Amino acid sequence: MVKIILNSFLFWGGWIIIPFIMEIVPALGSVFLLIRRNLRHKLHKKELEVYPEITLIIPVYNSADTLYGCIRSINDSTYPNDRIRIFLVNNKGKDNSFDIYAQCQQEFPELLMQWMNSEQGKSRALNLALYNSDGKYIINLDSDGMLEKNALVNMITRFENDTAINCMTGSILTVPEQIKKYKAGPSRLLRELEFMEYAQAFLAGRSYASELNSVYTLSGAFSAFRKSAVLKSWMYNTDT
């Protein structure tokens, strides 16, 4: 009887203790490190008096349904519009994305935007825009993404406050307001789980990895680079 109880205790204890050690303890540790990091950054953060010119590169491929929201989010950001230049690089798209671009030119005249056509794939399209850019910093943004209003200011401020940083990636989240449009059920639950997955990956996982200087990949949907560093690299690999 004692042996059965002991075996049961070890079995169920393993199911409780192992996840606690492997998941909960590191999670608590990461929360502590992130709080400490945020406090440290706030204490040493110096607000910018002059905003450097930045270049946003938006690859476009049949993006008519999302492109307007993407460009509007840039226009509505707190970064000065006259310090932003946008390259929209069309990669053999067949829809009316250009019409959306033309509409945005009319509605957001303060934004300097340029449409470029590339017939040789996304990587060559990105390299083409890089070579034609003038900004001190290069930011890649997917055409189905929408910026949080302070995202650009926060990112460039961090760059300017730490010259050792040559690249960084932003947090990618789905939009909670859009999830609420779905009725309760499997479809909405799936999107809620997706939001939690993104939140865990970016707000906790990558932030913790950043604190340990161990981020090994950047999100293609929203990443930024110091142009002087990028031009010393091999640029985007055109074989992929």
Question: What kind of feature is each model-predicted range?
Answer:
Residues 90-99, 118-120:
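A conserved acidic beta->alpha catalytic loop
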Residues 138:
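Short aromatic/hydrophobic "clamp" motif used to bind/position activated sugar donors
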